[in-house]
Amino acid sequence: MKIAVAGSGYVGLSLGVLLSLQNEVTIVDILPSKVDKINNGLSPIQDEYIEYYLKSKQLSIKATLDSKAAYKEAELVIIATPTNYNSRINYFDTQHVETVIKEVLSVNSHATLIIKSTIPIGFITEMRQKFQTDRIIFSPEFLRESKALYDNLYPSRIIVSCEENDSPKVKADAEKFALLLKSAAKKNNVPVLIMGASEAEAVKLFANTYLALRVAYFNELDTYAESRKLNSHMVIQGISYDDRIGMHYNNPSFGYGGYCLPKDTKQLLANYNNIPQTLIEAIVSSNNVRKSYIAKQIINVLEEQESPVKVVGVYRLIMKSNSDNFRESAIKDVIDILKSKDIKIIIYEPMLNKLESEDQSVLVNDLENFKKQANIIVTNRYDNELQDVKNKVYSRDIFGRD
């Protein structure tokens, strides 16, 4: 089967690699550097499994800048373009998705379009009405950055949307796509759910908001424990051994961040509109309170020091271990709070060559020099290369994992 994938981020590329094991896949991107890397068997993103598969597996995959040619020949078109949250309108910016839909429909009269981008509840219905077609369906992704292909190979569930009154072809394509994902997976007995588009859209936003809730819960627990001088590790362990709660996703942090949780929680809150709720709003608020609390704790530690020059060293901007981006990283908001108090900030981030021009922080990418300059070293996730200056480190990383 010929499949086109719009977007070579971790969602689009991982799906492209997965499906190219048994199908002919063309990745469409607007960046020549990404296209060149994929065509040379290199991954433009950090993902161990994607890197290995591109290098070692027999894949039928190519990348192109020529979107029209790719879409024209495709039987299925997967859309995995960004939908960043627009704080001005308090809604996802879906313009990239809509642009692809319009372009595909202009050159292809038969392909079914499968949206993998995270979208607002009701978006598929809106697009079907706007473009007067039922050939637009939704399949939410549940992937982690840096482990996207692994999560596609071992999925927790597969969800594809379809409506009762859809044409036989669209119904067949929805089932076919679900089967493609299931047959490419290494995990056996993966649950497959076919549901309405609005239900599928809701699953995605509510799932990520629950994860954000869990992060916020253990962060608030940790805030209480640190404030009352309790052993947070012991309290969390004592709670988490209850099978109903579980010993997972319970490691305190500076706040939830990354590409998905911040924007998805805000979008779900926006979707509630006039529907009664308090919990969803509280999750978003809790994350902001946590970051303010962390900044205050750092300031308190600084004030206890006698040094006339007080420098906060931020070790890594990445949100998670082994990540390769800083999108919505909680530490960035903590830095902004500290800078508003005229505190000098130095940053160790080997993935950066320079900071943005308006940034008042200083990039120090010699680790030993960084350690010497900083009065306190702040890190969301602890790393063993800080072991020799452990007495300088402030972190709420209790379990040494994400």
UniProtKB/Swiss-Prot annotation:
Assigned protein family: Belongs to the UDP-glucose/GDP-mannose dehydrogenase family.
Pathway(s) of this molecule: Nucleotide-sugar biosynthesis; UDP-alpha-D-glucuronate biosynthesis; UDP-alpha-D-glucuronate from UDP-alpha-D-glucose: step 1/1
The keyword Ribonucleoprotein is assigned to this record: no
Record lineage: Bacteria, Bacillati, Bacillota, Bacilli, Lactobacillales
GO BP annotations, alphabetical order: polysaccharide biosynthetic process; UDP-glucuronate biosynthetic process
GO MF terms, alphabetically ordered: NAD binding; UDP-glucose 6-dehydrogenase activity
Residues where substrate binds: E141, F142, L143, R144, E145, K204, N208, Y249, N250, N251, P252, S253, G257, K320
Pfam families in the record: UDPG_MGDP_dh, UDPG_MGDP_dh_C, UDPG_MGDP_dh_N
Keywords: Capsule biogenesis/degradation, NAD, Oxidoreductase
InterPro entries noted in UniProt: 6-PGluconate_DH-like_C_sf (IPR008927), 6PGD_dom2 (IPR013328), NAD(P)-bd_dom_sf (IPR036291), UDP-Glc/GDP-Man (IPR017476), UDP-Glc/GDP-Man_DH_C (IPR014027), UDP-Glc/GDP-Man_DH_C_sf (IPR036220), UDP-Glc/GDP-Man_DH_dimer (IPR014026), UDP-Glc/GDP-Man_DH_N (IPR001732)
Protein's job: Catalyzes the formation of UDP-glucuronic acid which is required for capsular hyaluronic acid synthesis.
Reactions it catalyzes: UDP-alpha-D-glucose + 2 NAD(+) + H2O = UDP-alpha-D-glucuronate + 2 NADH + 3 H(+)
UniProt-recorded name of the protein: UDP-glucose 6-dehydrogenase
Listed transmembrane segments: none
Superkingdom of this protein's organism: Bacteria
Amino acids binding NAD(+): 2-19, 29, 34, 83, 118, 145, 259, 263, 327
Residues of the active site: C260 (nucleophile)
Enzyme class: oxidoreductase
EC number, UniProt record: 1.1.1.22
Matching SMART domains: UDPG_MGDP_dh_C
